[in-house]
């Protein structure tokens, strides 16, 4: 079925960014925002070839006149028509391949609604005529990318965070925890606290500016209280940012108040545990004999784990929760923003994986529900 010479496609559809490329490559070929934009205004210049929707970078560059929508929220696809546009854009414009000629590996957050993967499967086979496909769990792929078979992965993207303990290659489903607190919530929170400084960001396009501020200037404080004191007594932590219109804004304690939400979700009114407690709780749900290995192999992955200082803070917080003599190691690979994709690239090019694909024939015989039987 799968010829050796046909490269599989690996598509990691995140809530914020879509990463796509070919299995066996060491980095994704295409990385673009998972955005579909529609014009807010009536077109007046006839013959300009205006489109009724724009995807990815093109939507981003024309954002001033568009309403931007993210079809994936909290890791779950909420708008399938837009999602189809994103996949179409991925195959035809970014990778320039015919999807009916390549097997496709897609990724998904754990504990997603079952209907979500079924619909993904259905669209791949019926709309794009894929010869074969597979849906893999994001965190498991990150562990592959770090070269381990045992560890606990804390994967945090734009829409959803989750901790997945894996022992000798087996995910432990009873101990998987999901946290609907991620990058997008931090962007929203930063929009809110910048309002206190007198800067108003309201539209979907302005939210993208705030996301950029967040990615460029925010960091995680090792000691939040101490950092707040430093910020109030001196201006050493202040940084300036130039807006697209040339106006310069100054941002101070917001730089670390924004990511602090990961450790104190109460900042945005969420009742859940912070990311350090969630990781700890996940480890505590595992068998007592394997906890030691999980503490020593805590892997961070995803774009929201890219804040400077987050690994040290995680180390400090988990050390405070764990038994005093426990060796704790937080692994934060520099390429962790793409580690899910890299893991997918590794998995899809393994010879042992080739019998795992769901083929078109199997789909035609069983329908979309086959995805639950063949994919973890």
UniProtKB/Swiss-Prot annotation:
Entries under Pfam families matching the protein: Actin
Keyword tRNA processing in record: no
SUPFAM superfamilies recorded: Actin-like ATPase domain (SSF53067)
EC primary class: hydrolase
Protein name: Actin, muscle
Chain positions found as N-acetylaspartate: 3
GO molecular function annotations of the record: ATP binding; hydrolase activity
Catalysed transformations (reactions): ATP + H2O = ADP + phosphate + H(+)
PANTHER family, per database record: ACTIN (PTHR11937)
SMART domains: ACTIN (SM00268)
EC number annotated for this UniProt entry: 3.6.4.-
Record keywords, A-Z: Acetylation, ATP-binding, Cytoplasm, Cytoskeleton, Hydrolase, Muscle protein, Nucleotide-binding
CDD domains: ASKHA_NBD_actin
């Amino acid at each position: 079925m799968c010829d050796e010479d046909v490269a599989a496609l690996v598509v990691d559809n995140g809530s914020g960014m879509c990463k796509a490329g070919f299995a066996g490559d060491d980095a994704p070929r295409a990385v673009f925002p998972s955005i579909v934009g529609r014009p807010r205004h009536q077109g007046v210049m006839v013959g300009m070839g205006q489109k009724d929707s724009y995807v990815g970078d093109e939507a981003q560059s024309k954002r001033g006149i568009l309403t931007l929508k993210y079809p994936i929220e909290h890791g779950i696809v909420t708008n399938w028509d837009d999602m189809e546009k994103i996949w179409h854009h991925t195959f035809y414009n970014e990778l320039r391949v015919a999807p009916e000629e390549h097997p496709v590996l897609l990724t998904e957050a754990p504990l997603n609604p079952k209907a979500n993967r079924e619909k993904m499967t259905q669209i791949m086979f019926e709309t794009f005529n894929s010869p074969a496909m597979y849906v893999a769990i994001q965190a498991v792929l990150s562990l592959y990318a770090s070269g381990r078979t045992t560890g606990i992965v804390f994967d945090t993207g734009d829409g959803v965070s989750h901790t997945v303990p894996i022992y000798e290659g087996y995910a432990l489903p009873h101990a998987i925890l999901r946290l609907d607190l991620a990058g997008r919530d931090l962007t929203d929170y930063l929009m809110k606290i910048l309002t206190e400084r007198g800067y108003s960001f309201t539209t979907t396009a302005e939210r993208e500016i705030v996301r950029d501020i967040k990615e460029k200037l925010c960091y995680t404080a090792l000691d939040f209280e101490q950092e707040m004191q430093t910020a109030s007594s001196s201006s050493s932590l202040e940084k300036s940012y130039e807006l697209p219109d040339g106006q310069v804004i100054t941002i101070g304690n917001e730089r670390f108040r924004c990511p602090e939400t990961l450790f104190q979700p109460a900042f945005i009114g969420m009742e859940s545990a912070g990311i350090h407690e969630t990781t700890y709780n996940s480890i505590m749900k595992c068998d007592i004999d394997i906890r030691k290995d999980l503490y020593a192999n805590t892997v961070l992955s995803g774009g929201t784990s890219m804040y400077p200082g987050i690994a040290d803070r995680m180390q400090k917080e988990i050390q405070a929760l764990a038994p005093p003599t426990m060796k704790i190691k937080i692994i934060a690979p520099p390429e962790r923003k793409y580690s899910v994709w890299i893991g997918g690239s590794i998995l899809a090019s393994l010879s042992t994986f080739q019998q795992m694909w769901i083929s078109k024939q199997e789909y035609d015989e069983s329908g979309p529900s086959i995805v639950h039987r063949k994919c973890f």
